[in-house]
Amino acid sequence: MALAAKLLPSIVAFVALACCVLRSSVASVDHHRKLSGWSIGGATWYGPANGSGTDGGACGYQGDVGQPPFNSMIAAGSPSIYESGKGCGSCYQVKCSGNPSCSGKPVTVVLTDLCPGGACLEEPVHFDLSGTAFGAMAKPGQDDQLRNAGKLPVQYARVPCKWQGVDIAFRVDAGSNQYYLAVLVEDEDGDGDLSAVDLMQSGGSGGGGSWAAMQQSWGAVWKYNSGPAPLQAPMSIRLTSGSGRTLVASNVIPAGWQPGGTYRSIVNFRRED
């Protein structure tokens, strides 16, 4: 009993330490989703000085990156925030203060690409911004001077996407056919990213009336193989955001759909204040 009494304080201290480690591990999983303030990262830029990085990128948005609502304000993220494509569509505020040309004011960018090596691996979180986005961090008239710096330390924060007046769009991949459907999902409000996508066909022998999980193909592209039975349109798509919110785009893929076609829904996640 005396030995147990002596060991008790050590046991209590060990349990307390273990709990702290566990809480730290759990917190790190949600680090980029529930940022409570500014964190430190790095930034470079790529593509034309006043451009949108490169067309396409590892998320699959192609030329849309230069159009509304992206408007060239995009970033290629380090693997830690690209998350094998699950980070596609997420929004961040980024600001710099380590250069005389920095305005110190945050700009909002959306993740549309992967920066897999080089400077993007020199710190835990790195943004390879479009030339437009990098220059937007500058004081008025000093965007070229800021871009000449090449690389800068930045502060960043995960923020909700605010695509006002824009509903979610589904672009059917050119390789889709009557047995295989792949869609690029874009313009999600709020979280911006997705953790799951499901498909419901219309009636018939192809699984109509029930939800079937789609698989992430790459980036923001999700796919479904219907097996021996052809796909039955119209088809509905259910989206689950990174934080677990769900949304259904009913009959968004119409009868007579075409590979390469873009079908815009009438729904979107609405930002939670």
From Swiss-Prot:
It is a peripheral membrane protein. Keywords: Cell wall, Cell wall biogenesis/degradation, Disulfide bond, Glycoprotein, Membrane, Secreted, Signal. Its main location: secreted. Gene3D superfamilies: Expansin, cellulose-binding-like domain, RlpA-like domain. SUPFAM superfamilies: Barwin-like endoglucanases, PHL pollen allergen. One of its GO terms (biological process) is plant-type cell wall loosening. Glycans are attached at residue 50. It is found in: Secreted, Cell wall; Membrane. This is Putative expansin-B14. The gene is EXPB14.
